[in-house]
Structure formats: structure tokens, C-alpha cells
């Protein structure tokens, strides 16, 4: 990981849990779906890819996420949060219809339990009348620390203070709740996993385990937010740092400015803003659609929200972009990070679709800076813009030469007498 980059802390936290799953279940005959999928490294090492693990996240190498074409041990491809229970239900229902007999497991982090898709799937559990095992990997983190009411419920259960109503919440969905177990202790985990497997023959089970993100590596344990994703050293400056600096400076002068994010405060560079203006900073958890509607509603009351999000995750809120923000022509600014080709995380995290799906949206102005200086200027301009702007930018860039920003006009960098015109966006 130090050479190729990748997700470090989240994978260190599930080593024992993954070993237990492979010990108790028979993969690939049994099927496992990893929610998000970034915590699958130990699974890959224990299946058929140990010898190829040095090629992780490289061209021609193994993916940093589950990949069906890579191995029969990867039964479903993931990359975004909240999909695992829906996928597990689909696999289990197909199993039932074909008269087959194998176990289906969804490994889901507590951060994903903020996502609405999880509850849509749970609501279908009784309707579909099938059996799955949900392993709730509770480490109190997504990329940032988990937030909200669901986090409080899970915390009460971990501390042994949870009322019966908390357990009943899961059982109302048709799940037999088991917990809470130490997911980093095989002596405790293996018997619990065996019991869950035996119960699975007649009912669906939720096995609640706690793990420590970054387990076994002191620096990761102390700063799991900083080591969730690790990149090889790079020389470029990051746009996200400029976003945090510029928004904080703008907010000092304009009390209408608020920041909204979906569980990615640090990755998007918003920590300075959150520290300076906690009452105007909103991390809603992994709830991209909700964050978009929240931004729209804030704008209807005279606030100027900046919704910062990775390009790949904005796809999840497309209906809300069209209907709630742009349909009402509201001055909510989309700060779209990791736009364009993003490299080693694979196709699930490329930011290559946003320009195509945003271009037809009414009332939306799309801005693409050529350097960080221009990005700062676009942010300043957006603070007084009366309609929704979308500023899309890559991870890294150079501060560059400042060019005046005019809406609806290209900057002419070079002109000669030929009949050839080259347009460059960004």
C-alpha cells in the first residue's frame, strides 16, 4: 500500500474479521458482498491473489475493490456505499429460485448505515422472504467519524446501554440480532460466526461486531481519518486545500455561506471551515441525496451553501441536482472534486461522467479551472452568483497564473492566423 497507494486503515481493521469469515464459510461457493469494497485486501490475500498482491491498483494488476472478472471469490462489484444488502438479497433470492443452497453474507460498515439505500433494502427483507447474514462492522468511522442518530443507537449497543427498542429496530426488519462482539479477537469472533451460520438456515441474521480502524499500526490507530486512503508521495498541490482556505476566507465576510458534505470533511479539504464555523458546517454522513436537498432548502432561505463532493459520488444525487437545486434555480454551489480520470481506484471512482450528465441540466453553469489560482477566483465569483454553479476540478494541480474569470467566455491563451481552433476545458 505504501508503494501503490490504497485503503490502509480500513483494511487493517478487518484482518481478523476476514480470517473468521474465511474460516467459517466456504468461499467461493458461499457468496460475500463487501459494502463499498475498499476493505477487501485481506479477502484477496486469503483467496487466490496473494502472489499478485504486489500489483494492487496498477495497470494490469489486481483492483483495489472487488472485481468479478478478477476472481470467482468476488461475487459482486462495489465501490459506493450502501449497496451490499440489496446485492446480497438479490443473490439470495436467485439462489432460492434456482433451488440452490449456499450462504450469502453482506459485510457492511457502520458508516453505510447512514445511507438510505440500506434501509430500502432492509425494508424488502420480509417481502423477499429469503435469508442473508449481515455482518455490521462497527468502527465508528466512515472516512470521517460517523454521525447522527444511527451512530448514537450503535454506540449505545456497544456500550451495553442500548434499550430493547434498539435491538427491536433490527428485529422489526426480520433480522435476528447478535452482538456486540470484538471483531479483532478471533477467540470471541469464531464462536459467534459459527452460531450465526447455524441460525442462517432458518432466518436472516445481523452480527454486530466492533473493530478498530488501523488495528495493529499505531499511527493508523491514532489517525484513522488520515490513513483511510494512502497515496504515494506526489509533488502537486491539491485543490481541496485551496477549497478549505478560500471558503473559510469567504465565510469570514459573508454569514450566508455554509458548507455541506457527505462524510468526507477531511478528504475534501473542509476541516479549516468546520473548525472556524462549526455552526455553519454540516456533515450529514454518507447521504449524498439528502445533502443535496439540504443545500437546496438552505438556499431557499437566503443561505449560500457549498456542497463539496467527489464527482463519482455526485452521480448518486443526480435527481436532486436536477429537481431540487437547478429546477428551482437556487444559488447552491457544487464543488466537484476528483473530476476527470482519477487513476488507481478503478472504474468505480472515475470522475468522467459529470460533464456529460450536468451539461443538459437547466440553469446550471459549469466552470472548470485550469489551475488553482483560477479555482480560487471561481469560488469568489460563485459567492455572489444568483444561480447554481458547478465547479469541477481534479485532485492535483499547480497554483498557476491568474487569469480573469468571465462567465460564458473562454480565456484566449494563444492566437495566430491559422484556421484551427483548439478548445480546452480545464
Give, region by region, the residue ranges found by the protein language model:
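Cofactor-binding active-site loop characterized by glycine-rich and histidine/acidic residues
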Residues: 7-128, 257, 261-262, 270-271
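Proline/glycine-anchored alpha-helix kink/cap motifs
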Residues: 19-23, 88-96, 132-134, 247, ...
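A glycine-rich helix N-cap at a beta->alpha junction
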Residues: 50-66, 126-144, 282, 326-339
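Flexible, small-/acidic-enriched active-site or ligand-binding loops
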Residues: 348-352
Amino acid at each position: 500500500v505504501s508503494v501503490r497507494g490504497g485503503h490502509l486503515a480500513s483494511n487493517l481493521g478487518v484482518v481478523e474479521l476476514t480470517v473468521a469469515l474465511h474460516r467459517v464459510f466456504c468461499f467461493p461457493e458461499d457468496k460475500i458482498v463487501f459494502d463499498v469494497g475498499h476493505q477487501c485486501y485481506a479477502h484477496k490475500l486469503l483467496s487466490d491473489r496473494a502472489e499478485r498482491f504486489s500489483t494492487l491498483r496498477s495497470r494490469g494488476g489486481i483492483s483495489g475493490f472487488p472485481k468479478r472478472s478478477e476472481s470467482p471469490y468476488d461475487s459482486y462489484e462495489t465501490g459506493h456505499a450502501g449497496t451490499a444488502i440489496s446485492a446480497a438479497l438479490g443473490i439470495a433470492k436467485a439462489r432460492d429460485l434456482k433451488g440452490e443452497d449456499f450462504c450469502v453474507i453482506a459485510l457492511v460498515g457502520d458508516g453505510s448505515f447512514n445511507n438510505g439505500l440500506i434501509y430500502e433494502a432492509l425494508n424488502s427483507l420480509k417481502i423477499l422472504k429469503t435469508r442473508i447474514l449481515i455482518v455490521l462492522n462497527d468502527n465508528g468511522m466512515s472516512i470521517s467519524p460517523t454521525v447522527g442518530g444511527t451512530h448514537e443507537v450503535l454506540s449505545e449497543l456497544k456500550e451495553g446501554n442500548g434499550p430493547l427498542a434498539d435491538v427491536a429496530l433490527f428485529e422489526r426488519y426480520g433480522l435476528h440480532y447478535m452482538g456486540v462482539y470484538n471483531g479483532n479477537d478471533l477467540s470471541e469472533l469464531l464462536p459467534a460466526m459459527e452460531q450465526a451460520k447455524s441460525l442462517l438456515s432458518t432466518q436472516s441474521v445481523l452480527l454486530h461486531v466492533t473493530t478498530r480502524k488501523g488495528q495493529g499500526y499505531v499511527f493508523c490507530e491514532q489517525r484513522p481519518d488520515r490513513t483511510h486512503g494512502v497515496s504515494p508521495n506526489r509533488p502537486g498541490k491539491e485543490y481541496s486545500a485551496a477549497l478549505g482556505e478560500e471558503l473559510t476566507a469567504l465565510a469570514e465576510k459573508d454569514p450566508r455561506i455554509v458548507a455541506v458534505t457527505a462524510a468526507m470533511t477531511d478528504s475534501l479539504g473542509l476541516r479549516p471551515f468546520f473548525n472556524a464555523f462549526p455552526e455553519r458546517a454540516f456533515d450529514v454522513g454518507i447521504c449524498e441525496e439528502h445533502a443535496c436537498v439540504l443545500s437546496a432548502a438552505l438556499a431557499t432561505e437566503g443561505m449560500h451553501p457549498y456542497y463539496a463532493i467527489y464527482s463519482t459520488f455526485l452521480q448518486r444525487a443526480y435527481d436532486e441536482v436536477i429537481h431540487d437545486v437547478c429546477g428551482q434555480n437556487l444559488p447552491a454551489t457544487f464543488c466537484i472534486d476528483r473530476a476527470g480520470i482519477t487513476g488507481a481506484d478503478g472504474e468505480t471512482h472515475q470522475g468522467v461522467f459529470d460533464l456529460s450528465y450536468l451539461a443538459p441540466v437547466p440553469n446550471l453553469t459549469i466552470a472548470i479551472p485550469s489551475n488553482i489560482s483560477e479555482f480560487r477566483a471561481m469560488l469568489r465569483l460563485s459567492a455572489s452568483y444568483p444561480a447554481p454553479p458547478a465547479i469541477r476540478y481534479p485532485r492535483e494541480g499547480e497554483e498557476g497564473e491568474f487569469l480573469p474569470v468571465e462567465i460564458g467566455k473562454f480565456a484566449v491563451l494563444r492566437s495566430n492566423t491559422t484556421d484551427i481552433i483548439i478548445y480546452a476545458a480545464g
